[in-house]
Amino acid sequence: MKFNFEFAEKISRTYSDECRPLCHELKLPQTAFDILMFLANNPEYKTARDIVEIRKIKANLVSVNVDKLVNEGYLERKPVENDRRKTELVCTKKAGTVIERGRRIQQQFTTNLFAGIDEEQKKQLTIFMEQLENNMDEIIRRKSHK
């Protein structure tokens, strides 16, 4: 079986193209927009370290773009209770309309991406993806026990 490793890059590029008009309007770099949407869509992740580890964005880019989002009033930094070393990133009220518009773009992108794919095929894709994730977890688990 031959995998097309360009697939993930193509999704990323196409998604960025869909976000470009909003980013341009807001004068936000794509990375800043991605950080804002990541924090809004994944409330379990709250720190710059989370963004680096989960989104795989380089630390210096996270730092610069978080500063921009804070300075523009889209994010606030709040100290983490019981751990002075950590700072939690919180979306502000001002970010609400941006997040709402971003989610509409994401929903439309998903709709367009899955055009021509019926519910049964989506269900099968979900099952396949879950199995691939389980397989990767098992590979990681085995490697960590060596």
Go through each PLM region and give its residues.
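N-terminal leader segment of winged-helix/HTH proteins
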Residues: 1-26, 72
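Amphipathic, non-transmembrane alpha-helical scaffold segments
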Residues: 8-12, 16, 55, 99, ...
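Short, locally clustered residues in the helix-turn-helix/winged-helix DNA-binding domain
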Residues: 12, 37-43, 103, 130
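N-terminal helix-turn-helix DNA-binding core of bacterial DNA-binding proteins
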Residues: 17-61
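Charged, amphipathic alpha-helical coiled-coil/dimerization segments
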Residues: 68-126
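C-terminal regulatory/oligomerization modules of transcriptional regulators
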Residues: 119-146
